[in-house]
């Protein structure tokens, strides 16, 4: 009998698929289409087990849909622009382009041995001029459609690297790379006007039925729709032409609890005061250090500066509130000013205690009968808005009412009194896309002294990045290139300058799904192809992309519809979304002489006696099931796994060990067990194949009850595996395949029935273990490639149970089982049980002392 050898099997079938063009997407025939897409990778140079799990899930879906008769589009590419390539250029003296293209070649070489059903003819990289040239064309179309704006914005500026930093790149107020104190700087930036679509993007979430509820909630919170009151506190003494402070609040019902007014360091009044006071200027400068996200501002220590200004309360002009400049107020939300109600906001309470400001309650908790309950004096009282409370300083609505009702009543009252107006605001801001970096898509505009800002002519696209740049000094190499910036104005022909900012890399990934439908077209999309293939039927990726990437893609799809590049049906581009769990692995740690942690690769640790040891006998601390991380060395190289066990083993294990939405822990023992199981499947199928060849058709016994039992289990397995794959229950489907393999191994059915079962087993395993399945199919004489074979269909008649399998106990211990007709008589069951091999061996010619049949339940043999 031959041995299961993935190193021989897998390359053979990969070559066969490639030569046959098996996975080249086609629009031919009267078939339904199916577009499955996994989020494309950044070309770091190495794939990891997380990639393997993600792409294997998509591959199972793609292969299954192909077998179900669909034209399948399953492409792959690279999200190839980004800061890492520039870092490589600075750290290692490698050009970003060379570094990126080598990494992409390496990753393709690592992905191909995994046997994914990818249409490699559609391979694209966002750093290819063919791709970003079409992105530039899209940008121009969006400019002309009024979807792009150019305006000033406050950014994180690294004065050493001379670049804008994302909020995530600011660490403790310093640039993550240079270590320089980050400045908040106002720069002219390009923006996509995504905020114009806030309400539409929010409302449309309700129609995304096949998206995880968690993702939709995260997007809804990010869009952040709120209903509130916008009004003004009048300044007691005007300053610099300002006589009021405009405030937006979502809790106007707490106005009578106000004890201070806070303004952002970037508020116009704060800027006026900066010019008049060195102390205020120093405080505002300190506030501008660090990140600009709401999350970072919320977690920072709350600091304020009493400006000495006072405002009048709109309901009690005799009452005056102090005005503070506060570091926790962002200029780009609301009006850049708030009133503080410490009794009902934890942040305001911290601030009030720090600066000895009054704390005045406007409402108190009550029980179900409306009786006042004691408050927790140590914390602000912030009940959920739907909960009823008793207002002790209310001014609108009922004395007992919910927060929601009180807010509505307060807005109505204030509008009637001429104190502001009710407004709806959104947290979502316009998408700033300007980056002062080289390795990105050039923004296709020209700055002309006579004409102003002018879009480049489309016939001049792509505007390609120059290769001859240097990274030996900080800043954007495009700014200092001797010739690249210089260009004639597209409008008047006079000497002009190119825009040197490049696009945020999120732009590149916000439309790639549409480009995959026609990756070689000379326009961003091709009408026939995009009409046929869109929408993406199944999108697969990590929950970490729930907000920015997915939200930006939803906006871009709308923009591309407006500019004529997508049909109306595609404004929500992803019909179904699945967010997979991570692959984890234990961490193996020791400490060095200075008690610093030292992390060890899994292959260097010997696991024995319940612990882990290095080659020299040093015991290691085992930290279980942590996210794989290069810094912790708890990573597993897929290429090494393929060399040791084969691609099918890696695929089988990442699918079988856990539900796909949960994390899966990679263990050597789990991989070994998966490999052994596939070896057993191979051996079983080889044995059945040999047995069938050794017996002539005429010599085979007629079909009997063993055949019926086996084929019945086969059809049940077809049903269960189909349901499992359709519902992303891959681990449940694999559990059914394990069970059916065991059934087949024990079966006494005819060779013909066993061969049919083997062929079906191969088809059901093909999406998960395509190479092994192809080999089994070929050995059993299957027609063509199993990758082209139709999916088996369960025979409904065979799913109706006409038999029952009863366990046989001998002296109280289960030893065997017997399958009989559901309506079999007691005598028939006894006869079949006494003929069972295990019972015959146990009796050894003697009669049983007692034989007990519990109909439909069990057979007990007492010896």
Curated annotation (Swiss-Prot):
Q: State the source organism's domain of life.
A: Bacteria
The record's principal subcellular location, in a coarse class, is: cytoplasm
Q: Which GO terms describe its biological process?
A: leucyl-tRNA aminoacylation
Instruction: Alphabetically list the UniProt keywords.
Output: Aminoacyl-tRNA synthetase, ATP-binding, Cytoplasm, Ligase, Nucleotide-binding, Protein biosynthesis
PROSITE patterns xrefs = AA_TRNA_LIGASE_I
Recorded GO molecular functions are: aminoacyl-tRNA deacylase activity; ATP binding; leucine-tRNA ligase activity
Q: What EC number(s) has UniProt assigned to this enzyme?
A: 6.1.1.4
Keyword check for Coiled coil, yes or no: no
Give the location of motif 'KMSKS' region in residue numbers.
Answer: 627-631
What's the catalysed reaction? tRNA(Leu) + L-leucine + ATP = L-leucyl-tRNA(Leu) + AMP + diphosphate
Question: What is a single cellular component term in the Gene Ontology annotation?
Answer: cytosol
**Entries under Pfam families matching the protein:** Anticodon_1 (PF08264), tRNA-synt_1 (PF00133), tRNA-synt_1_2 (PF13603), tRNA-synt_1g (PF09334)
**Which subcellular locations apply to this protein?**
Cytoplasm
Indicate yes or no for the key word RNA-binding: no
- Record-annotated residues binding ATP? 630
Q: Where is this motif: 'HIGH' region?
A: 41-51
The family note in this entry says: Belongs to the class-I aminoacyl-tRNA synthetase family.
Enumerate the HAMAP family for this protein: Leu_tRNA_synth_B (MF_00049_B)
Name of the molecule in the record: Leucine--tRNA ligase
State the organism of origin: Jannaschia sp. (strain CCS1)
Q: What is the lineage of its organism?
A: Bacteria, Pseudomonadati, Pseudomonadota, Alphaproteobacteria, Rhodobacterales
What would be the name of the gene that encodes this protein? leuS
């Amino acid at each position: 009998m031959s041995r299961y050898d993935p190193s021989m099997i897998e390359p053979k079938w990969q070559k066969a698929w490639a030569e046959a063009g098996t996975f080249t997407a086609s629009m031919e025939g009267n078939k339904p289409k199916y577009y499955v897409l996994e989020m494309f990778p950044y070309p770091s140079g190495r794939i990891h087990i997380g990639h393997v799990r993600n792409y294997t899930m998509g591959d199972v879906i793609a292969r299954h849909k192909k077998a179900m008769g669909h034209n399948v589009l399953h492409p792959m590419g690279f999200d190839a622009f980004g800061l890492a390539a520039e870092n490589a250029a600075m750290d290692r003296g490698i050009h970003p382009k060379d570094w990126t293209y080598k990494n992409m070649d390496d990753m393709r070489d690592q992905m191909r041995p995994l046997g994914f059903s990818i249409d490699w003819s559609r391979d694209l990289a966002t750093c290819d001029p063919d791709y970003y040239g079409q992105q530039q064309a899209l940008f121009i179309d969006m400019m002309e459609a009024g979807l792009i704006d150019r305006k000033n914005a406050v950014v994180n500026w690294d004065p050493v690297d001379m670049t804008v930093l994302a909020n995530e790149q600011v660490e403790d107020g310093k640039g993550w790379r240079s270590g320089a104190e980050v400045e908040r700087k106002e720069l002219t930036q390009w923006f996509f006007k995504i905020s114009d679509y806030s309400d539409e993007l929010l409302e449309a979430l309700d129609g995304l039925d096949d998206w995880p509820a968690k993702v939709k909630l995260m997007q809804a919170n990010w869009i952040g729709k709120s209903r509130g009151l916008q009004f003004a506190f009048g300044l007691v003494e005007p300053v610099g032409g300002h006589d009021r402070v405009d405030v937006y609040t979502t809790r106007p019902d707490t106005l009578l609890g106000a004890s201070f007014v806070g303004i952002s360091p970037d508020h116009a009044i704060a800027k006026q005061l900066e010019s008049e006071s060195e102390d205020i200027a120093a405080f505002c400068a300190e506030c501008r250090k660090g990140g600009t996200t709401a999350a970072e501002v919320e977690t920072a220590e709350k600091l304020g500066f009493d400006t000495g200004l006072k405002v009048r309360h709109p309901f009690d002009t005799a009452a005056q509130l102090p005005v503070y400049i506060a570091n926790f107020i962002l200029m780009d939300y609301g009006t850049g000013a708030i009133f503080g109600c410490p009794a009902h906001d934890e942040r305001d309470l911290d601030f009030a205690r720090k600066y000895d400001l009054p704390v005045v309650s406007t409402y108190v908790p009550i029980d179900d009968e409306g009786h006042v309950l004691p408050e927790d004096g140590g914390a602000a009282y912030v009940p959920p808005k739907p909960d009823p409370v008793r207002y002790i300083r209310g001014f609108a609505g009922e004395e007992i009412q919910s927060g929601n009702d009180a807010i509505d009543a307060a807005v109505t009252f204030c509008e009637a009194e001429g104190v502001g107006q009710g407004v709806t605001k959104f947290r979502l801001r316009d998408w700033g896309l300007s980056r002062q970096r080289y390795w990105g898509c050039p923004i296709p505009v020209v700055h002309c002294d006579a004409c102003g800002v002018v879009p480049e002519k489309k016939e001049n696209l792509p505007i390609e990045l120059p290769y001859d740049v240097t990274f030996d000094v900080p800043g954007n190499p495009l700014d200092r290139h001797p010739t690249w910036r210089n260009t004639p104005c597209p409008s008047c022909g006079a000497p002009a300058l190119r825009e040197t900012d490049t696009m945020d890399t999120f732009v590149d990934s916000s439309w790639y799904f549409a480009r995959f439908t026609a990756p070689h077209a000379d326009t961003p999309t091709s009408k026939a192809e995009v009409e046929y293939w869109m929408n993406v039927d199944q999108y697969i990726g990590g929950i970490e992309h729930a907000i920015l990437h997915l939200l930006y893609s939803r906006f871009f799809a709308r923009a591309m519809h407006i500019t004529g590049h997508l049909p109306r049906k595609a404004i929500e581009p992803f019909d179904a979304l699945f967010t997979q769990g991570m692959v984890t692995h234990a961490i193996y740690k020791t400490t060095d002489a200075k008690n610093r942690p030292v992390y060890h690769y899994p292959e260097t640790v010997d696991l024995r006696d319940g612990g882990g040891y290095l080659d020299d006998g040093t015991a290691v601390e085992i930290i279980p099931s942590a996210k794989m991380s290069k810094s912790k060395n708890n990573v597993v190289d897929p290429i090494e796994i393929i060399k040791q066990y084969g691609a099918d083993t890696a695929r089988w294990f990442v699918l079988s060990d856990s539900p796909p939405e949960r994390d899966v822990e990679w263990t050597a023992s789990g991989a070994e067990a998966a490999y052994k199981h596939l070896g057993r499947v191979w051996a079983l199928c080889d044995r059945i194949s040999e047995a069938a060849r050794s017996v002539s058709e005429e010599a085979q016994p007629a079909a009997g009850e063993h055949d019926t039992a086996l084929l019945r289990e086969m059809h049940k397995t077809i049903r269960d595996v189909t349901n499992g794959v359709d519902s992303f229950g891959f681990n449940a489907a694999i559990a059914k395949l394990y069970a059916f393999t065991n059934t087949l191994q024990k079966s006494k059915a005819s060779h013909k029935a066993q061969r049919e079962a083997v062929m079906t087993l191969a088809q059901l395993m093909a999406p998960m273990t395509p190479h092994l399945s192809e080999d089994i199919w070929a050995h059993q004489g299957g027609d063509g490639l199993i990758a082209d074979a139709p999916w088996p269909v369960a025979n409904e008649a065979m799913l109706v149970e006409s038999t029952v399998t009863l366990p046989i106990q001998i002296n109280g211990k289960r030893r065997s089982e017997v399958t009989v007709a559901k309506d079999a008589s007691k005598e028939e069951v006894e006869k079949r049980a006494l003929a069972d091999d295990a019972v015959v061996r146990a009796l050894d010619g003697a009669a049983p002392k007692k034989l007990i049949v519990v109909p439909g339940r069990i057979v007990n043999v007492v010896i």
